[in-house]
Regions:
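Minor-groove-contacting beta-hairpin "wing" of winged helix-turn-helix DNA-binding domains
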Residues: 60-71
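Positively charged, aromatic-enriched patches within helix-turn-helix-type DNA-binding elements
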Residues: 1-44, 52-57, 65
Length: 71
């Protein structure tokens, strides 16, 4: 996994059982940079899901519509 993918997983584990908003994850991951493409987080989440599915962890990261992500 890439550094950013690991940071996303770390953040989700740190807040396990809670819904993590996209904004909170983006702020943590990219340290409040002025501009981050809206699609950047989605791409990283998709890549993490694909890698986890390859080892049998399907649906490990759940999307909560209009709220964010949770484990």
């Amino acid at each position: 996994m890439t550094k950013n993918e690991l940071k996303i997983l770390y953040y989700l584990f740190k807040h396990a059982g809670k819904i993590c908003s996209r904004n909170d994850i983006v702020d943590f991951l990219w340290d409040n940079q002025l501009y981050v493409d809206d699609n950047a987080l989605s791409v990283n989440i998709t890549r993490i899901r694909d890698k986890l599915a390859a080892i049998g962890l399907v649906d490990f990261i759940k999307t909560k519509h209009r709220q964010g992500y949770t484990l």
